């Protein structure tokens, strides 16, 4: 960190300005982690059924997700579903290893921080609604 600061100072800049330049060039990224929590041990089967439906491509068939998903990755051995979404965004769903919950990870980008946050929030809400519907 000290070397980076010294280098930027020698160029008449500083770390904050350099970080702003990087954001201008590459955009902002926001990540959100959330989970659907289950209460009973028997819900483990429900979680398993949801993961199986993801592995079988059911999310891609849902009208609200169809235009968003570019490519799906199913890591059955790790029990993890991942989808690359339009705009360079990403969705990951996997069960917790220690608790009765499905974890949802969203990674979203934007040309501004607010845009990245808004996109991540929208995708997170959509993922939660979709999984909660499958939960009923």
Where are these regions (language model features)?
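Phosphate-binding and adjacent anionic-ligand microenvironments
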Residues: 2-97, 101-105, 112-120, 124-136
């Amino acid at each position: 960190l000290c070397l980076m600061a010294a280098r930027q100072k020698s160029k008449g800049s500083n770390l904050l300005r350099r970080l702003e330049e990087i954001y201008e060039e590459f955009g902002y990224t926001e990540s959100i982690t959330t989970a659907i929590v289950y209460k009973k041990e028997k819900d483990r089967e429900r979680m398993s059924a949801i993961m199986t439906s993801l592995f079988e491509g059911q999310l891609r068939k849902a009208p609200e997700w169809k235009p968003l998903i570019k490519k799906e990755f199913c890591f059955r051995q790790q029990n993890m579903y991942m989808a690359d979404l339009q705009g360079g965004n990403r969705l990951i769903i996997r069960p917790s290893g220690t608790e009765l919950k499905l974890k949802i990870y969203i990674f979203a980008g934007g040309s501004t921080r607010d845009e990245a946050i808004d996109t991540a929030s929208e995708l997170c809400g959509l993922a939660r609604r979709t999984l909660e519907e499958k939960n009923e």
